């Protein structure tokens, strides 16, 4: 059984959460694969390009997916179409990303992005703004806001998340009995509750619960 961590938007395999789960799983003899979903080309990033990276990484083998923010949404999208995903841990999953992201920019900024084709976005891994193509919006329109996967999953979401509303995870969990939702005293990063998340997700990720 393979385990993959899918990082968030404008992040990288070197994120704090990725390294936390890599270390914890290593302590239990489980290697964690952390692909670079942008493949070094953030400007031309799309949901389809990231799903293709995930598909190559899993190589059709049974796997467990851990996804953070946009990585959580991508994990849900991928699992909905690929039964070789056996279970998921979604951390503040960015449901509705294709519709929410441009809307939250505001009408003027979103229209300027559509017109020029590029938007400067702060990239956390690089510590500076990087251009992002409008193709991520156009490509994203083909994907469901709430991917309908049936595999067992744990969702962890911060009650004080100002980036992805916890109400989205609540809405998803109500209609999906395969999902266990944990609402935590944290923000979008969840860094202050990682040990708590490990307590209820560790056995699940190992296939023991």
Q: Where in this protein do the model-derived segments appear?
A:
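Active-site loop/turn elements of alpha/beta-hydrolase fold enzymes
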Residues: 34-40, 93, 186
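Aromatic pocket-lining residues of Rossmann-like dinucleotide-binding sites
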Residues: 25, 78-82
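Catalytic nucleophile-loop/oxyanion-hole region of alpha/beta-hydrolase
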Residues: 35-58
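Short hydrophobic segments within beta-strands
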Residues: 5-9, 66, 91, 156
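Gly/Ala-rich beta-loop-alpha elbow adjacent to hydrolase catalytic centers
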Residues: 67-75
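The alpha/beta-hydrolase serine catalytic core
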Residues: 85-87, 91-209
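Short, surface-exposed "cap/lid" segments of acyl-processing enzymes
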Residues: 1-39
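Short, surface-exposed alpha-helical segments at coil->helix boundaries
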Residues: 15-22, 48, 165-170
């Amino acid at each position: 059984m393979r385990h993959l961590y899918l990082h968030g938007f404008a992040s990288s395999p070197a994120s704090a959460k990725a390294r936390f789960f890599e270390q914890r799983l290593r302590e239990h003899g489980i290697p964690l694969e952390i692909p670079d979903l942008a493949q070094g080309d953030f400007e031309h990033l799309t949901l389809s390009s990231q799903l293709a990276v995930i598909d190559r990484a899993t190589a059709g083998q049974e796997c467990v997916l851990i996804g953070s923010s946009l990585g959580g949404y991508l994990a849900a999208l991928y699992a909905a179409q690929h039964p070789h995903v056996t279970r998921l841990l979604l951390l503040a999953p960015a449901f509705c990303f294709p519709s929410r992201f441009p809307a939250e920019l505001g009408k003027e900024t979103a229209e300027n992005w559509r017109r020029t084709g590029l938007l400067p976005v702060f990239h956390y891994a690089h510590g500076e703004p990087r251009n992002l193509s409008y193709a991520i919006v156009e490509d994203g329109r083909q994907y469901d806001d709430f991917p309908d996967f049936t595999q067992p999953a744990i969702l962890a979401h911060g009650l004080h998340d100002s980036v992805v509303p916890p109400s989205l995870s609540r809405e998803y969990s109500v209609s999906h009995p395969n999902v266990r939702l944990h609402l935590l005293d944290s923000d979008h990063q969840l860094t202050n509750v990682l040990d708590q998340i490990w307590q209820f997700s560790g056995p699940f990720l190992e296939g023991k619960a």
